[in-house]
Structure formats: C-alpha cells, structure tokens
Amino acid sequence: MNLKPIGDRLVLKKQEKEEEKTFSGIVLPSSAKEAPVYAEVLAIGSEVEEDEKMKGNIKVGDKVIYSKYAGTEIKLEDTDYILVKYEDILAVVE
C-alpha cells in the first residue's frame, strides 16, 4: 500500500535510533526517550513539487529533521509513518 500525500504534506518514515545507554551503562527503554525527530522522506505532495519556493529543497530519500510534535502518526502493514506539513521540516541532513 502506498501513501500519496496531498498538498504541502510529506510522508516520512521514522529512523530507528540505536539503543541508548546512560554514562553508567544503564540501557534506556524507548518509553524514556524523546519523540524521534529524524526521518526519511518517502513521498512529497504535489504542492511541494510545484511551488517555486519549496521546489527542490526536499527530495524523496532525503533524511530530515522535523518538529518534535508535528504531524500525524500512521501505522500501515506493520510500518510506522508520519505525515507532516512542509513547514514542519526544520532541516535536511547531508
């Protein structure tokens, strides 16, 4: 199943982080971690592709940092996705 974002939205796939440990070696459970802010762009809405100000800034496959509380989380076929607006993308990781 494919997600096709509408307007100025993007479909992102959250990037898994490695297991985190404290300085003393205690493994932090995922519930103790902050919400992920790194993701890979899987699809881009038509408005982002056509608007002169947005066009070319973000491409499918880019790794991005997005606003922590932005977007709508969706789970399809055991995969977690997040739909965010273009304005919620803070940076492209190069």
Curated annotation (Swiss-Prot):
GO terms for molecular function: ATP binding; metal ion binding; protein folding chaperone; protein-folding chaperone binding; unfolded protein binding. CDD domains: cpn10 (cd00320). Pfam families: Cpn10 (PF00166). Keywords: Chaperone, Cytoplasm, Stress response. It is found in: Cytoplasm. One of its GO terms (biological process) is chaperone cofactor-dependent protein refolding. InterPro entries: Chaperonin_GroES (IPR020818), Chaperonin_GroES_sf (IPR037124), GroES-like_sf (IPR011032). It comes from the Bacteria. GO terms for cellular component: cytoplasm. Coiled coil: none annotated. NCBIfam families: PRK00364.2-2 (NF001531). Belongs to the GroES chaperonin family. Together with the chaperonin GroEL, plays an essential role in assisting protein folding. The GroEL-GroES system forms a nano-cage that allows encapsulation of the non-native substrate proteins and provides a physical environment optimized to promote and accelerate protein folding. GroES binds to the apical surface of the GroEL ring, thereby capping the opening of the GroEL channel. Heptamer of 7 subunits arranged in a ring. Interacts with the chaperonin GroEL. This is Co-chaperonin GroES. It comes from Finegoldia magna (strain ATCC 29328 / DSM 20472 / WAL 2508). The lineage of its organism: Bacteria, Bacillati, Bacillota, Tissierellia, Tissierellales.
